[in-house]
Every structure is written in structure tokens, then in C-alpha cells.
Amino acid sequence: MDDEKIISQGIMQKHLRDLLKDPPNLLKNFHYEDVLAFLELGEQIHFFKGDTILSDDEYVNAAYLIAEGKVSVWKENIQLATLDKKEFLGETFLFSRNNRTERIACEEDCILLKYERYEALNYFRKRPEKLFNIFTKNIIEIQQNKISSMNSQLFALMK
């Protein structure tokens, strides 16, 4: 499907165009067509400020891309992180089923793209193996950055 056809159908919304121009880190080094196909795979879900997206210890088989807005991650009453546009929640969802989550809440009105595990796996099965290897490498880099950030925060707390 080309851009003109998508735009003429009214499917290509501003947040999707923005994500195509500057893809999230999880899709880094994907070709334009692969980024577009992956974005189209996601189910758009709208949330409002204060909404709970996922509850504590909920089991999920999906990941969420923040297309617009900002969310916070909570464990009990402690805010663990704030995530912005272009960040993923649960990016390791392809590697295990029924992942448990922390509470995810909207800090402002949001549009999330929800990716079901089964559909995402089928997406990669239909493409060259190299694309899944790039995706896996991106996940590892994201996880390394999260660990480094947590280490820095822990170190700051211990001072």
C-alpha cells in the first residue's frame, strides 16, 4: 500500500506520519516500508489523562507504542518511570507469553498502538530473518539503556 492510498483512505493520521518521519528506537534501521507495515499492524487505542492502561500484575501478550502523549509506570505507590511519545511498553513481549505488568497510567491524553504477540510474530515470519535480527538488537539496546538508567538512579539514591 502506498502513502497516497493510505492518506486518501483517511487512515494516515498525524501521529502515524510523525512516527514514520522519526521512527521509535525499536524500529531503528528498518526500511521505510517495514516501519509503515509495522505501524499499521498496531491497533489504535485512545486514553485520557488519569486513565489506567494496565493494572498491577495484569498478564498481557501485547506491547504498546506511545504514538501521542505521556504515561507513567507505577509499582504500588511508587512511580518508576515516565514514558513519552515513541517509547514502547513491554517491548520484550515476543519472547515470552503472559508477561506481568506494573500499573500504567496516562499523564495526559494518549494514543497508543497495541501490538498483539501473535500478530507481531506473524509480521516477522513473513519478512526476511534479518529484520527480526535488527528488531532483537534494538530490544537489547533498549534494555541495556534501561539497566544503565536504573543503575544511575540506584547509585544516586545510595549517596
What are these regions (language model features)?
Residues 1-159:
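Cytosolic regulatory regions built on CNB/CRP/Popeye-like sensor folds
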